[in-house]
């Protein structure tokens, strides 16, 4: 009898396994998307005062044809901007090597060949291109030669227009503040039901204002049409060359030399030797350049801590005398009325942060911002050093910077108290620097082919539960049959 039981057991188990296998093969499957691989992109932001490298990453499959991009890492290039190497183009290229070596480590090796690498130069190179196009070309050729030596997919080095710089800064700000697309708690991307913010960027050589508008564009050059994340946007943008912080300081310095013989925006007790060649070498100060001046001559200049004269000096930077349109900002440039909330970054942030944090002054309203600027301009050099130790390098220029920001926002762009209440001053958002570079990469990802998503065969949860129950039933049935056979074998045989 035991032999009979042993002979029945394998067929029973085999039948159960076969039945389970047949059921498994009959269950319909569907394609389930695997987590997408990451792609990387590198942007070198070649500004007027310095160069920064940003490495971005995004899923290889994209959301509505624009990559979901986040900052992976960054690196500040030592030295000045590449435009400062006009007499030594190879120095511009060599300055980038340290950050490029870091990029080799930050981007996975297997992704090097597919990682696009871009260099975008802004107002510093725009100015150099105006005064010395040959030198500008030589600098771009030198950095191009170095960038092509690395295993990345180099896509070019070029000078961005002021319009591009403004628009890409606007894209960055709104992306980081989740106005285009947001990751919800349900684990899906969705478009939030809120408007966009305007963006104001104050660089070293230019300043940009960009915002979405429904007003008709009287100057077509100031209107840009964008398509991001399946949505269409019409924005106003304008870039003012020579109105960046560094160039404004140079222009004020040139005016002070010509008009006063002292600098009303510098603190009393501060003096320095000014090299005339440094003051007048920029095209921004060319109109103020005296005839037959000695570029190697040095002039001693002292500060006077005079906020009223400083305000007059800053006001001279703006012209409101003529406007060929229904309304203008300044210098005859068309601008619709500012609308909605704004984010102000770069030197806007650093200036206001100095007033708010270092000086402890309120800046929540335009009136408070003006009072804070006057407060700083009233300080002597000794008082400023005692109040803000450790910032000697730029300390003497904060009065002029604060006056300029206040005048630019109130008189230049036309912010009143109500509109100014909607302006936030911000350096970073979501651990990512606010600037044009991320917006540039977001725009360029429309041109980068998406990898097809990886697929694997998967089973619905409900089907999986049914299979589990069937397997368990088959095994239980086999066990019951086995026990019955064993029990039958133990009973006494009848004759």
UniProtKB/Swiss-Prot annotation:
Cytoplasmic side: 1-7, 484-495
Residues exposed to the Extracellular side: 29-462
Listed EC numbers: 3.6.1.-
GO cellular component terms, A-Z: basement membrane; endoplasmic reticulum membrane; extracellular exosome; plasma membrane
Glycosylation sites: 64, 129, 294, 378, 443
Transmembrane segments: 8-28, 463-483
GO molecular function: ATP binding; GDP phosphatase activity; ribonucleoside triphosphate phosphatase activity; UDP phosphatase activity
Gene Ontology terms: biological process: G protein-coupled receptor signaling pathway; nucleoside diphosphate catabolic process; platelet activation; purine ribonucleoside diphosphate catabolic process
Cofactor section: Ca(2+); Mg(2+)
Tissue: Brain, placenta, skeletal muscle, kidney, pancreas, heart, ovary, testis, colon, small intestine, prostate and pancreas. No expression in adult thymus, spleen, lung, liver and peripheral blood leukocytes.
CDD domains the record matches: ASKHA_NBD_NTPDase2
Binding site for ATP: 204-208
Annotated Pfam families: GDA1_CD39
Keywords: ATP-binding, Calcium, Cell membrane, Disulfide bond, Endoplasmic reticulum, Glycoprotein, Hydrolase, Magnesium, Membrane, Nucleotide-binding, Transmembrane, Transmembrane helix
Active site: 165 (proton acceptor)
S-S pairs: 75-99, 242-284, 265-310, 323-328, 377-399
Keyword DNA-binding: no
Class of enzymatic activity (EC top level): hydrolase
Free-text function comment from the UniProt entry: In the nervous system, could hydrolyze ATP and other nucleotides to regulate purinergic neurotransmission. Hydrolyzes ADP only to a marginal extent. The order of activity with different substrates is ATP > GTP > CTP = ITP > UTP >> ADP = UDP.
PANTHER family with a match to the protein in the record: ADENOSINE/GUANOSINE DIPHOSPHATASE (PTHR11782), ECTONUCLEOSIDE TRIPHOSPHATE DIPHOSPHOHYDROLASE 2 (PTHR11782:SF33)
Family of this protein: Belongs to the GDA1/CD39 NTPase family.
The name this protein goes by in its record: Ectonucleoside triphosphate diphosphohydrolase 2
Organism lineage string: Eukaryota, Metazoa, Chordata, Craniata, Vertebrata
The encoding gene: ENTPD2
């Amino acid at each position: 009898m035991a032999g009979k039981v042993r002979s029945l057991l394998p067929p029973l188990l085999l039948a159960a396994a076969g039945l389970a296998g047949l059921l498994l093969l009959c269950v319909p499957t569907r394609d389930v998307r695997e987590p997408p691989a990451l792609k990387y992109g590198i942007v070198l932001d070649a500004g007027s005062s310095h160069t920064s490298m940003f490495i971005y990453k995004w899923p290889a499959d994209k959301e509505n044809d624009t990559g979901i991009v986040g900052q992976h890492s960054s690196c500040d290039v030592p030295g000045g901007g590449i435009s400062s190497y006009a007499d030594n183009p190879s120095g511009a290229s060599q300055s980038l090597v340290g950050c490029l070596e870091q990029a080799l480590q930050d981007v996975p090796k297997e992704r090097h060949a597919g990682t696009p690498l871009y260099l975008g130069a802004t107002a510093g190179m725009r100015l150099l291109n105006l005064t010395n196009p040959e030198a500008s070309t030589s600098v771009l050729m030198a950095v191009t030669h170095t960038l092509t030596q690395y295993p990345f997919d180099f896509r070019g080095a070029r000078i961005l227009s002021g319009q591009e710089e403004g628009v890409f800064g606007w894209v960055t700000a709104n992306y980081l503040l989740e106005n285009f697309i947001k990751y919800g708690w349900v684990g899906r991307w969705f478009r939030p039901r809120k408007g966009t913010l305007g963006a104001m960027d104050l660089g070293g050589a230019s300043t940009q204002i960009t915002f979405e508008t429904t007003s008709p564009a009287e100057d077509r050059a100031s209107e840009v049409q964008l398509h991001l994340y399946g949505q269409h946007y019409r924005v106003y943008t304008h870039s003012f060359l020579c109105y960046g912080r560094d160039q404004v300081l140079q222009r004020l310095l040139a005016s002070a030399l010509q008009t006063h013989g002292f600098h009303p925006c510098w603190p009393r007790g501060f003096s320095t030797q000014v090299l005339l060649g440094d003051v007048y070498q920029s095209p921004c100060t060319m109109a103020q350049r005296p005839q037959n001046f000695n570029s190697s001559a040095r002039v001693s200049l002292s500060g006077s801590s005079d906020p009223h004269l400083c305000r007059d000096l800053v006001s001279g930077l703006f012209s409101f005398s003529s406007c060929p349109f229904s309304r203008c900002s300044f210098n005859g440039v068309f601008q619709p009325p500012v609308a909605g909330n704004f984010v102000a970054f770069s030197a806007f942030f650093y200036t206001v942060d100095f007033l708010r944090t270092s000086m402890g002054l309120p800046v929540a309203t335009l009136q408070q911002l003006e009072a804070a600027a006057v407060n700083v301009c009233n300080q002597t050099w000794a008082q400023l050093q005692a109040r803000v130790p450790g910032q000697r390098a730029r300390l003497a220029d904060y009065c002029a910077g604060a006056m300029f920001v206040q005048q630019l926002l109130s008189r230049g762009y036309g912010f009143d108290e109500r509109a100014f209440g909607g302006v936030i001053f911000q350096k970073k958002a979501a651990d990512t620097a606010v600037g044009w570079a991320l917006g540039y990469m977001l725009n360029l990802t429309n041109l980068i082919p998406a990898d097809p998503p990886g697929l694997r065969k998967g089973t619905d949860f409900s089907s999986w539960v049914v299979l589990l129950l069937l397997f368990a039933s088959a095994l239980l049935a086999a066990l019951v049959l086995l026990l019955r056979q064993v029990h039958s074998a133990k009973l006494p045989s009848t004759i």
